[in-house]
Amino acid sequence: MTFSEAAILANQELSQLLHVKGLIGTDYQPFEVGAGGDISSGIDLKAEEIFVKYLSPFGTILSEESGTFSHPTSSIEIIIDPIDGSDNLLSHLPYFGTSIAYMEEGKCTHAIITNLANGDIFIKNHEGLKKATLNHLFFENVTCNTFSKVGIFERSYCSQKILPKLHSLGLKYRSPGAFALSLAYAHEVSFVLYEGVMRTYDVAAGLFMCEDLHTYFKDDIFLVSKDKEIFDKISQLFISN
């Protein structure tokens, strides 16, 4: 079994758990603060267990929930966010997914991000960025959407620097609440913007998927856009200050 095949099977099992069996009481239960700094819920830990089962043969797993699951011999690191946007999931808001980054010598060479709400799955490796659905694994190349009307501004509700200035540009945006998943859609939307503390669980896979786009990643600001004009307009809001 290849790494991609294992990752797909893990996502399919998790999707089956969510959409067929459904959430139960313990899935909503909060547990301890996870390795990523957020409180893990029961469904976070269930999802992690599924990914560890499928991916542990390939290398050491670094999970946002429980931290490190060591591999005895492999130098490969696999960075996972078992549920990206778990607050959305627990609030029954259909925008949540999973993120997997396969790291060789500190560099991401293979990434899988899945939207568990609608089944979209994005995979990037040496063959480029491709997209399919979990139910129909017919992968097609991802190209830039030239008709996008909105961008994504994750965590806009707690923006300290950009939000007041962004309104002056007249750009439409949404703040759906799953950063890694939003990065997977960066070729579709006008831009993806984030202000705040960034963790490797959030950006490792998405940054690799966006490396062909215009990108700014420094301190607490992350901006990516397929449109150079929009990228320049937004980046000047914080580069010049």
Q: Predicted segments — roles?
A:
Residues 117-119, 125-136, 141:
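A conserved active-site-flanking secondary-structure segment within enzyme catalytic domains
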Residues 69-73, 91-92, 104-106, 115, ...:
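Solvent-exposed alpha-helices and their adjacent loops that cap or buttress functional pockets
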Residues 44, 85-86, 186, 210:
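Buried hydrophobic positions in well-ordered alpha/beta secondary-structure cores of metabolic enzymes
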Residues 1-80:
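N-terminal subdomain of lithium-sensitive/metallo-dependent phosphomonoesterases centered on the IMPase/IPPase/PAP
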Residues 23-31, 58-61, 130-132, 169-176, ...:
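Short secondary-structure junctions
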Residues 72-126:
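DPxDG-like acidic metal-binding loop motif
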Residues 140-241:
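An extended, acidic
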